[in-house]
């Protein structure tokens, strides 16, 4: 699968390296609106630099676009790529509004191309092992989940995180555990939430002050179709430490993933009243995050005609959940969620 990157910012290098390491994938081109960024990435990874999005989309040597632009541009860039007949994998969120996300899903179907979206951390070894244990009843019926998405103060390391502070931690990192949990326990049907800004004045590494455009602390209670209740916390104030994991609590025990992000997370199970014990993963895990895993799955799905796992429909549902949380914050009332999606299949080695 020949890939064109749109956006050569903070995570583009990680995608490019992962694509290079995957035999099924080829980095065919890159474009970026910021002068010099695409050229630097292309020099390191030996690919074509396109002077514009239009030029990349006109290149027959690119069949799949990976959208790595800022969240505010995701919907427009993805729509342009789909209109051009390209398959698309978008960084999260698929769009900032559910209406736009649904429109992208419909456009992909109309054009006969695939629409995939991050996050794809569900495909990691630790996450797949946890899902298998849940399906097999290792902790009984799951009724409650604690999900932590605390990402500290991005301005301490990110060169310019202002676009991320405009959408806030709910959208930027809350979508990761949401994608995993909705795959495991089905769509969310109702959301109720609280949010505030803990640190209203921030400063970039170069000394430039800025003000976040969205709350930097969000707590949401989500009711899933399967009856599970999730408490999700997302923050750009609290550091991760032990605050970046998933706890699944069932009738006969509990399961803990210290991090939902990395494929090589530890995995611990506690029987009722017992101690947490580390569990073996189903296979040797990838170290950290495999940024190309959803792309490898997409390439295989296109080649074999099966559904890909990180689907646009699933991503659009996550967008509606995020929108419902924001609506609940604004109204101080519960907000219903109506969309659905076909749940992904476990990976072959995790069935």
Where are these regions (language model features)?
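N-terminal Rossmann-like dinucleotide-binding module
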Residues: 1-45
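Active-site loop of classical SDR/Rossmann-like NAD(P)-dependent oxidoreductases
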Residues: 33, 285-295
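Conserved SAM-binding strand-loop segment of SAM-dependent methyltransferases
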Residues: 46-53
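Hydrophobic residues in well-ordered beta-strands that form the structural core
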Residues: 51, 67, 89-90, 115-117, ...
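Beta-strand-loop-alpha-helix segment that lines the small-molecule cofactor/substrate pocket
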Residues: 64, 70-71, 75-122, 137
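C-terminal helix-rich "cap/oligomerization" subdomain common to oxidoreductases
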Residues: 64-66, 102, 297-351
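Predominantly a Rossmann-like dinucleotide-binding segment in NAD(P)-dependent oxidoreductases
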Residues: 121-211, 332
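Contiguous beta-strand/loop segments that form the cofactor/metal-binding neighborhood of enzyme cores
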Residues: 179-263, 292-306, 340-351
């Amino acid at each position: 699968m020949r890939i064109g990157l749109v956006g050569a910012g903070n995570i583009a290098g990680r995608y490019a390296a992962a694509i290079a390491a995957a035999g099924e994938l080829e980095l065919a081109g890159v474009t970026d609106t910021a002068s010099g960024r695409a050229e630097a990435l292309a020099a390191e990874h030996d690919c074509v630099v396109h002077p514009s999005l239009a030029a990349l989309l006109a290149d027959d040597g690119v069949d799949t676009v990976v959208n790595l632009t800022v969240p505010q541009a995701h919907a427009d860039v993805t729509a342009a790529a789909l209109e051009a007949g390209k398959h698309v994998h978008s960084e999260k969120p698929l769009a900032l509004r559910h209406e736009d996300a649904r429109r992208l899903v419909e456009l992909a179907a109309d054009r006969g191309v695939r629409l995939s979206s991050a996050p794809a951390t569900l495909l990691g070894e630790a996450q797949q092992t946890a899902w298998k244990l849940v399906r097999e009843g290792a902790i009984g019926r799951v009724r409650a989940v604690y999900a932590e998405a605390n990402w500290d103060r991005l301005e301490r390391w990110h060169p310019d995180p202002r676009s991320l502070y405009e959408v806030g931690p709910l959208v930027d990192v809350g979508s990761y555990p949401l994608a995993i949990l909705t795959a495991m326990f089905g769509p969310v049907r109702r959301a109720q939430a609280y949010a505030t800004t803990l640190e209203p004045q921030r400063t970039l590494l170069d000394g430039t002050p800025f003000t976040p455009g969205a709350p930097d602390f969000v707590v949401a209670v989500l009711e899933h179709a399967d009856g599970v209740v999730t408490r999700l916390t997302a923050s750009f104030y609290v550091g991760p430490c032990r605050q970046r994991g998933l706890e699944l609590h069932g009738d006969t025990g509990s399961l803990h993933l210290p991090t939902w992000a990395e494929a090589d997370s530890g995995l611990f199970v506690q029987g009722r009243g017992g101690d947490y014990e580390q569990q073996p993963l189903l296979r040797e895990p990838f170290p950290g995050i495999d940024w190309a895993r959803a792309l490898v799955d997409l390439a295989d799905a296109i080649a074999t005609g099966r559904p890909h796992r990180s689907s646009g429909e699933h991503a659009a549902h996550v967008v509606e959940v995020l929108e419902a949380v924001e609506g609940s914050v604004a109204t101080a009332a519960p907000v219903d969620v109506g969309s659905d999606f076909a749940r992904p299949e476990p990976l072959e080695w995790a069935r």
